[in-house]
């Protein structure tokens, strides 16, 4: 009987060691909306990217589109609120981007961070680098986006995600003139 218990304990310990040590929800969707667009009214929209739009976004941004269904809200008076996910090193990072009426980044908020390390991507100074960026901006580490030592993959993947969302705005959301 004792031997059986020991054999059950070892797999349980190993399973616990492979689980992420930290998963933190910082903001709900409503809290992120309030942080980016205080006092504004937002209307959730149902938008699904077509196959052609997905291909064009991938070609333009250089980033794979994982989901065709967009999580987007249109802001009364102009602008967009978009919730997206990217992979950090091993786990998803959920973030929100607010875009102005002309498609510039208004603000970036990290909503859920599930990695053990690299939470510095939540630092306001680092996130401020994205403000004003539009479609066509490089959004590359050590170029127009400063890398965070110890959070390189999270930094890179968030920059890639924002670049993809800017391409999504340009190719699928921007009002036609």
Model regions and ranges:
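Positively charged n-region of N-terminal signal peptides that target proteins for export
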Residues: 1-6
């Amino acid at each position: 009987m004792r031997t059986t218990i020991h054999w059950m304990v070892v797999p349980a310990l190993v399973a616990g060691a492979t689980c992420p040590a930290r998963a933190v929800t910082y903001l709900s969707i409503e809290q992120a909306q309030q942080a980016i667009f205080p006092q504004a009214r937002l209307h959730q929209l149902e938008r699904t990217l077509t196959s052609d739009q997905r291909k064009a976004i991938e070609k333009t941004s250089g980033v794979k589109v994982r989901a065709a269904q967009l999580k987007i809200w249109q802001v009364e008076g102009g602008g967009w609120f978009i919730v997206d996910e990217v992979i950090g090193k091993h786990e998803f990072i959920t973030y929100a981007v607010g875009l102005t009426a002309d498609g510039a980044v208004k603000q970036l908020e990290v909503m859920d961070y599930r990695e053990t390390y690299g939470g510095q991507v939540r630092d306001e100074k680092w996130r401020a680098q994205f403000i004003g960026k539009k479609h066509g901006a490089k959004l590359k580490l050590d170029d127009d986006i400063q890398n965070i030592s110890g959070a390189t993959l999270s930094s890179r993947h968030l920059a890639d995600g924002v670049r993809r969302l800017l391409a999504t705005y340009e190719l699928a959301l921007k009002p036609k003139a």
